[in-house]
Amino acid sequence: MDCEKMGKLPVPRTDSVRVAVRVRPFSQREKNSGSQCVISMHARSITIRDPKDAELVKTFTFDLAYWSHDGFQKDEDGVLIPSDPTSKFAGQSDVFHDIGRGILDSAWQGYNATLLAYGQTGSGKSYSMIGYGANKGIIPRVCEELFQAIEKQKESLEAQVMFSMLEIYNEQIRDLLSRTKAPGGLRVREDQRLGFFVEGLKWVPCEDSVQIEKLVEQGSKIRMTASTNMNASSSRSHMLIAIRFKQVFLDTALTKQSSINMVDLAGSERQRSSGSEGDRLREGSRVNLSLTNLGNVISALADLAMGKKVLHIPYRDSVLTKLLQSALGGNSRTTLIAALSPADICYEETLSTLRYAERAKKVRNRAVINTCPLVRASRAENALLLGFGGAGAAEHSACFWAEQQLGTWGTWAQLLEQARREWEQQYMALAQEQQMVKILPHLLNVNEDPQLTGVLKFFIHNGSCEVGRAASNAICLQSLGISDKHASFTNMDGKVTVAPHITGKVIVNGVPVSSRTKLQHLDRIILGSNSAFLYIGFPSERGAEDLGRFDYDFFQMERAAAEGVSVDMLGTASPGDDQADPSILAVFQDYIKLMPLVVEANQMSEELKKGLKMELKVKNLASSDSRGCDLQKEVMVKVTKQGTHEVWIWSKAKFINRKFLMEELYQRFLESRDSHVAQEDDPFWDPVEVLHLGSAHVWLQSLAHRMMLEEQVEFLNCEGLEEAVLHIQITPCSPEGWAHGEEDTVIDPLELLGKRIDFQIHIVQCLGVKWLKEDATRGIQLGYKVYDLPNTLYTKPVWQSVNPRVEESVHFAALGVSREFLNYLLTNALVVDLWGLQEGCAHLGVSQPDVLFTGEGYIMVDTKTFSSVKDITSNQVPELYQKLLKLEQETELLRDINRALRGENVYLKAALENAGSAPQGERRYHKPDNPEGATVTAAGEAKQMCAQRASSDSQLARALKVFYGGMSVARGQLLRLRQCRPPEDDQMLRPFVHQQSQMLKDLEDLLESSLQKLKSDVAFIVKKKKEYLLPRGR
């Protein structure tokens, strides 16, 4: 205080950004999906586990950590509190005690204070900042305690509190306390001493916390209306609430000024670009760029704090970073609260948030106390400035920044009086609305942001109530997909009905309706593309329902269920496990999230006359790899150009990026009716590309027995539906290219170890290609990859034929067959991919610089050097090891029997030939009574014996083939058992032991069943053979 009285500049205080993390409970959608918690917390440390790999664990430590996931209950007032004394649950009061009080302390001392809420959409940012119902968040609690403290000190100081609320969307600033919107948004100006500020932003003087609470409600309503009209989700905008707090100490002629900024940042998943690398318009949206630039600023400041050389801090790259310049690396005490989802399906986003917070805590600020000892001189100068209408105020002392914002409004008392008059008018409107809520049925808006749900109420008066885009309608909606005359609600005889007009899209409880439909209390209604409302019936129909369960997710899940979309459609739990696969759940969540976005994109395409139809698909929904295992599923969007039939496939990330750009173009169209854009900048256009249509699986077991294979196999698309039929031949051959015959068939594939194998893959034809039926100008190519080839081989393009003949052969050679290659042939399929060509697209073709060729010019396979697997001691899985040894001995015995039977077959063949050429009297067969039939009988028996011999050989070959296939699987399981190591985490030992026990049991069952099956088959074959070896009639 002495230095302040002497007029000296206060000494800056260096502080690091304080970082807190908070883990929310499961959402209803996550509960319904059976999500698992992947986060644990100990003191201030957060540990996150990869749901796909339990051994991959990462730990982070922060200044503050709050566990709000479980261990809570509601008290009689609806406040969430710990369920028992041992619970580690942190409620709203705990968060405020550490963070909110810190903000207040800084403000009273004269420091600027900033609070940033960061996290993915739905992670609980708004709940921590504002809260819901009785569980008030940081912002209302800060305001309440600020005015309570002012009241206690009103005798010794004069306190002035001013409030503003703004939104940043697409690099435009909207004043949420002003009902008029400036064209292009408010502008950010820069002053040499003041830094960046928003020109023309409305500041409202406040004298109690109730007034601020109502201003927040007013701002939320304007924000909701604006986002509806602009088709802009609030999750993609930043909301900034600012409080200017000025203390005038009456006894010391001293002032302290503090700026409190509380920012609810846009959903952090929006900045991620992974998966959109192939998009030529990558990061084209300014919505994406603002959070990306914020990350760049934080990274640069973190590097600076660590002593690295940083040439430039990119504050000027976005509106958001300009306004947060003082909060990050400047004159402010800053806290960042990172909101986390604990669900396994949100693992990637949660890990990204933790890493972001880890960088932020390295940023260092230099906060100073904002004081001015010359308050009287300041007021005199301010009066002089007001005489000039406030012109040139920005060029004067920084001590007058608050007065500069006031402009010509007059004294503080006059400002308060003006605010009271405005408040009284708003209060009368709010009171009238609250009275109507009690007596009239109405529609309650439901938004993706829970903070904006219930902000809009549309009352359905007696008679007919029209809904549409036109201003003459009783309910005017400017949102996407709303017609001028969209639908009508009728309130008559105690019943409310809804009837869509000809072009109006109306969905009730997930189902589209086309005729007048009676509404029941709590019915869910979607108008147009995605304007969601909850119908609140007459007072007599209402009860003590929990309206919170009808959230945005509920609407979308209901809509998906009506369209037949469910987790079961994507695949259920793993065998022996009741829990659904986390990757399947994540795909399902992505599908639900993208559903409304695709509907909106189609509507924009229609209104902008772009002629695109977008459909949500699941990549690899019914696809498998060469071993028959399911491929990783992901959501994609199929885009079709109506008229030209051009088709594109967009990844999830690419579609989201394009959707941002579509919104920008659509907004420009709404404002100026101009949607013209250069083709290369058009988010609705892409160059044509090659598309993957489907895959066919050709199993290679026959090659391991040197048997020819000729098949017609279906090409199945990602949904498991037939796209075409493949005619293919796989022929084992000699090094000269001659096909092997039956005499070259190998019963035991192990005989091929270390030997050379040659084979040819001949793709003959594709039949009934739907891609070509739809448009005769299209073409196809086929691609496949054999074992360890470094690249895929493609056939030549074939155009304009529904049944295109390919007729391409490739000769392959394995010079020394390895056990791994043999196992590949026994257990894998050749996956042939069908690719669709469009007019103007480039053909598929890959150079083969790494492919090895034999001296004859054939492609070499099985060229890898395999590392041997370490042997294990006999005491590791000893029982199975002994069984495997015994099984190998019995297998060798069966091979001996097989060799003896083959020798006997040769002898019988020779004896049969001798019997056919010997005189009739010398034949071993009994002479029949009919001499003429003797020759016929002998010949018939000879044919029968030959047929039986061939049948026995083929049956034995099949039996051994099945047995060796089972043994290959058993060897693979044994290798996996040998390679398994117990986890270091004690908590994972029980699942590990359970998994190992199950694997041992499966292997034991496989060995036992394979052996019994082989014994049974061989016994049956030997019995049948002996029956035909015995002389007939003896």
UniProtKB/Swiss-Prot annotation:
Any one Pfam family match given in the protein's UniProt record, by short name: FHA
Gene3D superfamilies: 2.60.200.20, Kinesin motor domain
PROSITE patterns from the UniProt entry: KINESIN_MOTOR_1, KINESIN_MOTOR_2
Keyword list, A-Z: ATP-binding, Coiled coil, Membrane, Mitochondrion, Motor protein, Nucleotide-binding, Transport
Subcellular location field: Mitochondrion membrane
Binding site for ATP: G119, Q120, T121, G122, S123, G124, K125, S126
Membrane topology: Peripheral membrane protein
Annotated Kinesin motor domain residues: 16-363
Coiled coil location: 875-904, 994-1027
Main location: mitochondrion
Any single Gene Ontology cellular-component annotation: mitochondrial membrane
One MF annotation (Gene Ontology) recorded for this entry: microtubule binding
GO biological process, one term: mitochondrion organization
Superkingdom of the source species: Eukaryota
InterPro entries tied to this protein: FHA_dom, Kinesin-like_KIF1-typ, Kinesin_motor_CS, Kinesin_motor_dom, Kinesin_motor_dom_sf, P-loop_NTPase, SMAD_FHA_dom_sf
Domain FHA, first and last residues per copy: 465-528
Family: Belongs to the TRAFAC class myosin-kinesin ATPase superfamily. Kinesin family.
Protein function: Microtubule-dependent motor protein required for mitochondrion morphology and transport of mitochondria in neuronal cells.
Protein known as: Kinesin-like protein KIF28
Gene: Kif28
